[in-house]
Design a protein with these regions (language model features):
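Short, small-residue-biased leader/transition segments that mark boundaries at the very start
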Residues: 1-3
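Membrane-embedded helix boundary and interhelical linker motif in transport proteins
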Residues: 28, 50-96, 100
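Membrane-interfacial amphipathic/re-entrant helices at transmembrane-helix boundaries
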Residues: 7-39, 68, 79-82, 108-113, ...
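Inter-helical junctions in multi-pass inner-membrane proteins, predominant
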Residues: 21-36, 176-181, 207-250, 273-282
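Cytosolic-side transmembrane-helix boundaries in multi-pass membrane proteins
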Residues: 9-12, 131, 191-205, 275-308
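Transmembrane helix-bundle core of multi-pass membrane transporters
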Residues: 104-179, 206-209, 271, 276-278, ...
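Helix-loop-helix "hairpin" substructures at the membrane interface of multi-pass membrane proteins
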Residues: 154-231, 255-260
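Alpha-helical transmembrane segments within multi-pass membrane transporters and channels
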Residues: 44, 77-120, 127, 260-265
């Protein structure tokens, strides 16, 4: 216990001594990791807002996309070229998952959909563990590493590329949702599914497309994870916790808030890692989620008191 306290104090001292340089490094790393969080969280917000399904397999979709890129890499397909391939495969997988699982539980109680997606999560974990093994895997993207401040700040170009790809893909999704007829139908269904049916929108098809689009988004996020971090079959729960924390804090249908909260969570994890150790990074995400839930509950109580 005393040793861990001393380590924390040493890390704090290091952070303050090298504050300008360390803060630049932490802020950059938070932005890089936050961009990937934002993609996965937006997919969850889409499914949650349109279908009222809390997908507990969200993180496993991300890891699955990463493993698909990993497999393609070993047959000579680079991760950037693999992006559209993985997105397409994950889209098809999402459609099949909807037809086999989600469609059967979407009209039931929320607890039923939670159990269904939790079961899907466990299934995917075991399949990935069976195929790829429990070892940590990564892709050598062969991107160079840039340095700043005489080498004290490192900027892996793989992370810069992943940030640009995440931003470009997010922009495509926004344009699609606002300009395309399918995107407008998704938004109409999210606002009022019954009214959308009256207007002639096939909501069942919209639900299938929405869940598939979410899977494709997670697949792209997974490819980016494979470039800049590591893959392991049971890491999905970590990304699921992060996406739920982000969506809970940002709210549904608010993309700027999702992006902002994703960056904040990325920074929180980076500072928690440097001060308390890498094992505290995930704990920081859980604490953020708990803090948001408590804050939401306080806000609801205040609103009820005003109504009374």
């Amino acid at each position: 216990r005393r040793s861990s306290d001393l380590t924390m104090l040493d890390n704090l001292q290091l952070l303050f001594v090298y504050a300008p340089v360390m803060n630049v490094q932490m802020l950059l790393d938070g932005i890089f990791i936050g961009a990937v969080f934002a993609l996965a969280a937006y997919g969850l917000a889409l499914v949650w807002g349109v279908m009222n399904v809390k997908n507990l397999a969200q993180g496993d979709f991300v890891i699955m996309g990463g493993y698909l890129a990993f497999s393609l890499y070993h047959v000579g397909v680079g991760p950037i070229i693999a992006l559209p391939i993985v997105a397409l495969v994950m889209f098809v997988f999402g459609w099949i998952s909807y037809l086999l699982i989600i469609k059967r539980v979407i009209d039931n109680d929320m607890f039923v959909s939670l159990l269904a997606t939790f079961g899907l999560s466990l299934f995917l974990q075991q399949v990935m563990n069976l195929i790829y093994g429990p070892e940590v895997q990564t892709i050598d993207s062969k991107f160079p590493i840039a340095t700043m401040f005489d080498g004290f700040v490192t900027v892996p170009m793989a992370k810069v590329v992943s940030l640009l790809l995440a931003g470009g893909f997010a922009a495509l999704i926004v344009v699609f949702m606002k300009k395309s007829r399918t995107g407008q139908a998704i938004r109409a269904t999210a606002q009022d599914a019954r009214a959308a049916r009256v207007l002639g929108i096939n909501t069942d098809r919209i639900y299938a497309f929405t869940f598939s689009l979410n899977a494709a988004i997670c697949g792209v996020a997974g490819v980016l994870v494979s470039i800049i971090w590591v893959l392991q079959p049971f890491y999905g729960i970590v990304y699921s916790l992060r996406t739920f924390a982000i969506v809970t804090a940002a709210g549904l249908g608010n993309l700027p808030a999702v992006i902002g909260v994703s960056f904040v969570l990325g920074w929180v994890e980076q500072y928690a890692g440097i001060i308390m150790g890498a094992e505290w990074q995930i704990a920081a995400a859980v604490m953020v989620l708990l803090g948001v839930l408590v804050w939401r509950q306080i806000q609801l109580r205040r609103q009820r008191q005003v109504v009374r």
